[in-house]
Every structure is written in C-alpha cells, then in structure tokens.
Amino acid sequence: ECLGIGNQSISCSFYIFHDYFKQQCEEHESVIYFALSSAASGQYQTANLVKSEIEEENPNADFHIVDSQKFSLYIAQTAVHAAQMAKDGKSVDEIITECEKYIKTWRCYLLVDTLKYLEKGGRLSKAAAFVGTMLDIKPILTIEHGLVESLDKLRGKKKLLDKLIAKIQDDSDFDAENPKFLIVQSNEDKGQEVCEKLRDEYGEDCIEMYGEFGPLIGTHVGRGAIAILVKIVTE
C-alpha cells in the first residue's frame, strides 16, 4: 500500500497444502486442521481435495478437516484448546466435537479505522462507505454464519474504544463473572490501550491471547483495526 500497489489476497495453492499436510500425516498419528470459514475462503475446499489425495497415497493417514466458520484468533485459540485436550488424552472425535462447541463460546467485536478496505473487498457498498465516512459512522462488525456481518454502529471519532467496550459490557451474553478476552489488532498503540482498559476493569488475567492481524485479514480490515473476542455464556 505504501508503494501505491493495491492490496489483494489469494488462497493457498493445492500443492503447498499437499506438501505440508502430507508431511504432518507422516509425522503424526492424527492431524486436525481448523480451516478458515468455507463461506468466505476457498481453503476448506482446497484442504478437502488435498485430504482425498493424501488418503489415496497413504491409507493410514488420519487427517481431519473442520470448517471453523471463523477467522484469525478464533482459530488460534481453538487450536490451543485442542492441543490441551490432546495432551489430556482425549480422542480425536472428542477433540473435534468439543472444539466445534468451544469456538462458538467467543463473540467478535471488530472496529475498523477506515471503511475503504471493506468497500474494496466487497463487504460494504460504495454508497454505504461514502455515507458512513461523511457521517463519521464506524460499523462494529462480527462473524456470523461464517461471514463478516454488521453488529452495530458507533458515531464520531472520540472515545471509540470506550464506546466499544461499553457495547461489549451491555451484551446480555457477556460473561461478566468470568470475563475473558482475545485481542487482535493492526495498530499496536490501539491494541495496548484496549488491553490496559480491560485489565484495569477486570484484572491482569482477563486477556487470554493477544496478537496482530496477519496479511490475509489485514488486507480486508486495513490499518488501525482492532477486534475484541469476548467469552460469552452459551446454553
């Protein structure tokens, strides 16, 4: 972007997937892959093609693919949870079943600094992006049914992070008795500010994971974006 080159993303190739997972299946008794949402990415479909070929080459391969219906730290946190279950001696089926439930116990609140990248990526119409920019409207986005969806809106430029945290606290599903957060950002200062605010409110241990948007998600959310994943109460 700094060089004036437009941002774009491309799915990982079949051959890269194949070589990587072939090696993993040879080195491990079982392999579980949590794929990006199939509704928004071709990775899940590519992984299934790779799985079929690997199983033809190696009938003993125990390769499982899970459509996470999510992105980013959702998947990272679920992978950590799966690894702990494996250490505890849980079976592959138990791990997959539990993780499919576990990933739904987090809710995403994503705030972007500019609407430009959402418009470029087709997530927002040009008209909506223009009106939103003119009126200083910032959409709060979330992940529903495997896609980025609008959850709410904030107006103005001041104290946006305070307003975002207030929205989270007003969520009827927010687990206020045991608050846990995952933070991912494309602006370190903003990320640290959110961490400080949450720790002041809920204690040092409330943030379970902190990270930076990778190039794939960063392409679509742009600089200055921040997502807070919140542990919610589920039935």
Regions found by a protein language model. Give the residues of each.
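N-terminal glycine-rich anion-binding loop in soluble enzyme alpha/beta folds
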Residues: 1-16
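Structured helix-beta-strand junction loops
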Residues: 2-3, 27, 102-105
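N-terminal glycine-rich phosphate/adenylate-binding segment common to multiple enzyme folds
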Residues: 16-47
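Mixed-charge interfacial surface used for oligomerization/domain docking
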Residues: 39-43, 47-53, 57-64, 70-235
